[in-house]
Amino acid sequence: VASTPMVSLGVRKLGADLGIVITASHNPPSYNGFKLKSSFGGPSIPDDIAAVEKHIPEKAMKDLDSMDKIKEKGLLSYVNLEDMYYEHVMASFDIPAIRNSSFTIGYDAMYGAGYLIFPRILPQAKCLHCDYNPSFYGQAPEPIERNLKPFADMIKADPNMQIGIANDGDADRIGMFDGDGNFVDSHHILLLLLYYLHKYKGLTGKVVITFSVTDKMVQMAKKFGLEYEVTKIGFKYIAEIMTKEDVLVGGEESGGLAVKGHIPERDGVWIGLMILEFMAKAGKSLKE
């Protein structure tokens, strides 16, 4: 099982022209469809999508080669995208600091594509809904507060748990709870990311958000002397700017967030690890 960010990362690392993800994203499985990823490792821009659409036949094609014949022609090969992603994570984060920290981590995969990779990175995490179930047990795997009540209850029941992280069906979005089981929305996560990356890690760059995000992001960018831009709703607008400019943090209100040093793509696992690294370095809980 590969998450959407794994495919996006694979496209860029392998120098591919295009990536295709079959996913319902944060929707029920009946919404399964295509997500296209461009060569830069992010959501395809309108020009790339239009180029693909030109090749869609008016009638369904029936005379397609079998998978065996395609492999015989050398047109198909298999790549372990999970291993590629894991190695990229291990080279990018201080994972030992997170693993050796004193806080307990909760993780809700919502039966989605993060159910293998997150426990692999952090084996000590207490997992919920980390099973393979293509139907998501009938729930919509969107990491918003009303869909995460069992996860909130699990966190409240464990006095040692200081953070809960949830991902959607294809693991590109994030939801978060503090140790008291209070939901932490994307606005607050973005503020934490900006503070950590600039104040702790000394990084600079542009701040790009959609107009539905809290104005406190603009205020913080101004305070730090950083350039900022507010875009229309839709992560593709953020991704397009990330491919052309030096962007420190980008995000939208719906849980799609991206940061410097990674692909121009939403990545719920990556953002969760960034917050965990912040906690480990600061020695503080999420609530603090």
Model-derived segments and their meaning:
Residues 160-163, 203-288:
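Phosphate-binding and adjacent anionic-ligand microenvironments
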Residues 1-31, 120-121, 125-177:
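N-terminal small/polar loop signature for handling phosphorylated ligands or for N-terminal nucleophile
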Residues 32-159:
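Gly/Ser/Thr-enriched, mixed-charge loops and adjacent short helices
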Residues 2, 43, 47-51, 80-84, ...:
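Conserved active-site and cofactor/substrate-binding residues in soluble primary-metabolism enzymes
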Residues 134-141, 195-197, 238-243:
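Short, charged, surface-exposed secondary-structure boundary motifs
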Residues 1, 21-22, 107, 127-129, ...:
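General beta-strand structural signal in soluble alpha/beta enzymes
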